[in-house]
């Protein structure tokens, strides 16, 4: 017969009960936990949806991609300028925030397109082409009184803005504009738009290099160069450009001009200096016009 357990005294029973861990009611903890988690998830989802609906998420993503694409020396200043220009009316927001004047809207479109075109140097081929496409979309967007697409009038106005802001004399760039402009009501496809913008930017750099070259030739006291020397340099430059006749891109002519080495230039200067008769001077404007004409002659006209 097994021995029965001896019951504990009341005082020991009370001590054992005190040592048992207290258990929270099962009905309270799970409900409060689920409520707090669900509220946090709902708040996070609501904030994310809010940013997505405003376009902030996509805007930040586009800004960071642009920094990676261009790799500016001062990324913070670049981003500040980027977001400042984002304040202009976006071409995809369907007319929201459209200014009262159609002319003002057109100027905003041109300013926005011009800003995109300047983000990357034309030598950064991929980044430049991407920015050209964005600029084309800015100008091609439809509005309340504008059909989608880019017309020749807007395209020609942007070409003039690029050249004017580039600092080149009007008489120097005018022959190029006459070759690549379109008629006012003519539809301008992206390919022509890209070639026209690239031609303008390359010409501006070409003229800047020609100006630096003229500084080496000119008499500091008179700000003119000997005509024989200037013409000899232009003839040598023309020969360097002729080597790029098989190239189709305007940048190839710029590269050909940069191959105007010191040896060829020195020989041209020696030949010019060997003449004994006095020569009339050549002004800077004339030299730049003739140098630009060498490049413009290689550009194919539109149409």
From Swiss-Prot:
Gene3D superfamilies: cAMP-dependent protein kinase regulatory subunit, dimerization-anchoring domain (1.20.890.10). One of its GO terms (molecular function) is tubulin-glutamic acid ligase activity. It is found in: Cytoplasm, Cytoskeleton, Cilium axoneme; Cytoplasm, Cytoskeleton, Flagellum axoneme; Cytoplasm, Cytoskeleton, Cilium basal body; Cytoplasm, Cytoskeleton, Flagellum basal body. Keywords: Cell projection, Cilium, Cytoplasm, Cytoskeleton, Developmental protein, Differentiation, Flagellum, Microtubule, Phosphoprotein, Spermatogenesis. GO terms for biological process: adult behavior; chemical synaptic transmission; sperm axoneme assembly; vesicle localization. Disruption phenotype: Male mice are sterile due to defects in the development of the spermatid flagellum. They have reduced body fat content and fail to attack each other when caged together with other males. Coiled coil: none annotated. Its main location: cytoplasm. SUPFAM superfamilies: Dimerization-anchoring domain of cAMP-dependent PK regulatory subunit. It comes from the Eukaryota. The keyword Cytoplasm applies. The modification Phosphoserine is found at residues 46, 279. Broadly expressed at low levels. Highly expressed in brain. Present in brain neurons (at protein level). One of its GO terms (cellular component) is cytosol. Part of the neuronal tubulin polyglutamylase complex which contains TPGS1, TPGS2, TTLL1, LRRC49 and NICN1. Interacts with PCM1, CSTPP1 and LRRC49. Subunit of the tubulin polyglutamylase complex (TPGC). The complex mediates cilia and flagella polyglutamylation which is essential for their biogenesis and motility. May act in the targeting of the tubulin polyglutamylase complex. Required for the development of the spermatid flagellum. This is Tubulin polyglutamylase complex subunit 1. The lineage of its organism: Eukaryota, Metazoa, Chordata, Craniata, Vertebrata. The gene is Tpgs1.
